[in-house]
Swiss-Prot record:
Belongs to the class-II aminoacyl-tRNA synthetase family. Type 1 subfamily. It comes from Borreliella afzelii (strain PKo). Homodimer. GO terms for molecular function: aspartate-tRNA ligase activity; aspartate-tRNA(Asn) ligase activity; ATP binding; nucleic acid binding. One of its GO terms (cellular component) is cytoplasm. The record marks 31 as: Important for tRNA non-discrimination. This is Aspartate--tRNA(Asp/Asn) ligase.
Amino acid sequence: MFKVIKCNELNEKLINKKVEINAWVKKIRHHGKFTFLDIRDRYEKAQVLITEEHLLKIVEKIKLEYCIKIQGLLIKRPSNMINANMTTGYFEILAKNIEIISKCNELPFMIEDDNNASENSKLKYRYLDLRRDSLKNKIILRCQATHLIRNFLVKRKFLELETPTFVKSTPEGARDFVIPSRIHKGSFYALPQSPQLYKQLIMIAGFDKYFQIARCYRDEDSRGDRQPEFTQLDLEMSFVKKENIFKLIENMLFSIFKNCLNIKLSKKFKKITYKTAMNKYGSDKPDTRFELTLQDISRNLKNSEFNVFKDILNNKGSIKTLIVKDKADTFSRAKINNLEEIAKLYKTQGLYFTKIENNKFSGGIAKFLKTEEQQLIKAYSLENNDIIFFIANNKWEIACKAMGQIRIKIANDLGLIDENKFEFLWVYDFPLFEYDENTKTYIPAHHMFSIPKKRYISNLEKNPNKAIGEIYDLVLNGVELGSGSIRIHNKELQQRIFNIIGFQKEKSEDRFGFFLKALEYGAPNHGGIAIGIDRLIMLMTKSTSIKDVILFPKNSFAASPLDNSPSKISNEQLKELGINIAPDDT
């Protein structure tokens, strides 16, 4: 009788015992009168030794990735053949029976981590690519993490509730994926961009702690960290402040990193305001694994003779600087030109610089800073071989963002980023609105359901540009991992927000009437957060794209080479739905 086991279950206790393993053939090695098979299942790899003549004839028919059944005797490897890097490296199976369960066609690419197959080929044969250890392990880690999330929240009395996936189209910034209704011709459902309104309705219903591992859909251009369909941990709580949510998420992530990666995070993440993040790092999602911080030098240059700086300051603009210590000699003209190209992307007045040599400014705009030279050297403790970069712009935000991107580029070039570090950060107190120069209207900076901080409520309509919301983001290594807020629970205030963004009563009733009505029935104060599961696992596994941690992702054109979706449907289906396809003018 053979004991059916998995590859990882080979151990000392089974030595000289009969075992049976079902697995795939990873490698075939012929050595004269005997052959080795390296086999693999989900759990581990193992080595099979074939010596019997009738079995060697079967092996002649076996190719890579055949699915086979091996029955044999577990024996110890000779000392010179031990592989201490494998948990099964001390044993091998002496084959007694071999059965081919299923053959494998010629492979489109080798099942190896370093194969050079194209992305489309890997996605077309995703079921083969998933046999690679590195990809398989990422998917398994994702399963472990979501399991931990569920257990963590259920233990804290959260209810896992499912919200609809056919919803009313209420665009939240990106385009909706729409679904035509056969029964209600001319009407459409939308796939949810998030469960935002439904989770707020859940709070109004009295379920004070909700979570969901939610599938969400946004019709937007694909990027390395975006897909048309994605997964997020969505949660909401009644009667809370943002600090309650911070503590919950910090403890949850502490558990995930400890159990999945054996990494002990701090149980209390750093916290900074949006304004500090922009001023110090030039980003609302700063990478804090390295210092290299921005400084505002406007005050020191208020009497500057340099016309560019003078004009900017006369227009109440900003001058941001970045000081790189003891590295001036590494910045060639070509390298500085590359940094200037980044500044141009933000339509700044340019990137300026000067170096410190012999205790004075040298090169770049040194000749325009003679008056301020010694004052700046003293104020910023500048030393020989330092280099100082300047960006000036009439808009504070543009100056910050441009210099923030240059900060990242310099950090990468100088190798300042510790890739083994996980730096979490809460960014809070975001602006409630942004002004859209194209439409000349205010739009929500995050979304339209976030409550303003109390001191801004009375003057909302008068100064929407100054309003700060109870809004917060969770950032990990410069990537926005999650976003949340304390929500509006008052119908009148919600309508005021709608009015500011141009959703007057008729329009807001049409789009959100059902939600406004619900706010009339004893809505509790509540807040929550959504955390991108795909992004979290991408960062935990040090992947370069969320495609690496999604089981069956789309390609960069939001298409699936695996099943050739999206695809056309028949004229009969279109007719049934009452849809006519406009001719393609291209």
